[in-house]
Amino acid sequence: MQGYVLDINVARDEDLWVGVLTSSKMARLYRFYGARHSVIQIGHKIDFEEEQEGAIPRLRRVMHLGFVWERDNHRRYWWQQYLRLLYRHLRDVEEMEGFYYALLDQASRRLERQDAKRAILESHAALLEYEGRSHGLERCFLCEGKLGEEVALARGFIGAHPECVYGRGIEKARIEWFLREKNSTHLSDLEVEELWKILLQGV
């Protein structure tokens, strides 16, 4: 079985509870500490076995399926940031469709050749559409007034007047195109940084 490590918590001594997103579920597995065990980090794609002993499912025979870009500390850090956010979003879900696993597979391939923040933001736009949260930018979610040519964005990339959320305005047409096409090539680095700050508020 393969999956992405989204969460790690110390149980006792050096044993761990590990949250692994697979193509069909969010597995929460117990890993006993062992000197010969490979290191597990959030963001790793792993091949593993799930072993059921009593009431506690165990994580066994773990192999890290590494990516070349993981050698880049910045890329790895941003990837880990997003996966932590994704875990908070999915932690109460047990069984799920393969969309989320496929999304991370696609994003991890993009990270080989694309700016990390742009790759992750484009994947996040696809997630919003899949979950039915890719709202239009016609009205401010706070005052419900019609939005103009510049909009500010809140968590989940929902639109608002800049003055309503005390946020930076971004050209609405550019954001609409980004959300529709899941493509950030037309966005400036400053706009990407603004979207990244919003993403860090939560999935």
Positions of the model-derived regions?
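Non-catalytic alpha-helical scaffolds and adjoining flexible linkers that form interface surfaces
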Residues: 1-14, 23-203
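SH3/SH3-like beta-barrel fold
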Residues: 18-20
